[in-house]
């Protein structure tokens, strides 16, 4: 562990306090346990990327309409520092920064949209690297019923129960 990696140091101390083992021992022992289940990765993708971005934008607008700004303001008013791990989540971090610097909250919301799109892109890239992932592709509107049927078919075809 790097001495400046506060989050991992805290996690290592939590593991030691809970188990009496160092994080290295815990990780080594965890890897030595044989997997009881074979993983089956099912990934969902929209072929039309701009449509995914529109869905993300609509979701952020919905979160704002449901009171995300008030929630962030409330947490800050309670003295929760903006550097707290929970306040680093997408949405909280950007709105807290806008509020604390006096920028318009609307700018913070636009930044939430940008960060959410960047995160979605990283997720898709991560899944694409998994050569064993089974992809369910949507043109535009998600067809959840078809996705459930496709997923069920993949599970049965893989031999999983």
For each feature predicted by the language model, list its residue ranges.
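Catalytic core of IPPT-family isopentenyl/dimethylallyl transferases
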Residues: 32-161
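Phosphate/Mg2+-binding loops and adjacent switch elements
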Residues: 1-39
């Amino acid at each position: 562990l790097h001495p400046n990696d506060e989050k991992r140091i805290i996690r290592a101390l939590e593991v030691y306090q809970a188990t009496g083992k160092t994080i290295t021992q815990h990780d080594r022992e965890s890897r030595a346990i044989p997997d009881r289940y074979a993983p089956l990765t099912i990934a969902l993708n929209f072929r039309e990327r701009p449509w995914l971005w529109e869905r993300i934008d609509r979701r952020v607008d919905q979160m704002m309409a449901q009171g995300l700004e008030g929630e962030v303001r409330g947490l800050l008013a309670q003295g929760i520092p903006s550097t707290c791990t929970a306040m680093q989540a997408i949405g909280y971090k950007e709105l807290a920064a806008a509020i604390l610097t006096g920028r318009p909250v609307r700018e913070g919301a636009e930044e939430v949209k940008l960060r959410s799109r960047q995160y979605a892109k990283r997720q898709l890239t991560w899944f694409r690297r998994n050569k064993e992932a089974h992809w369910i592709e949507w043109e535009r509107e998600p067809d959840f019923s078809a996705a459930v049927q496709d997923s069920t078919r993949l599970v049965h075809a893989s031999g999983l129960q």
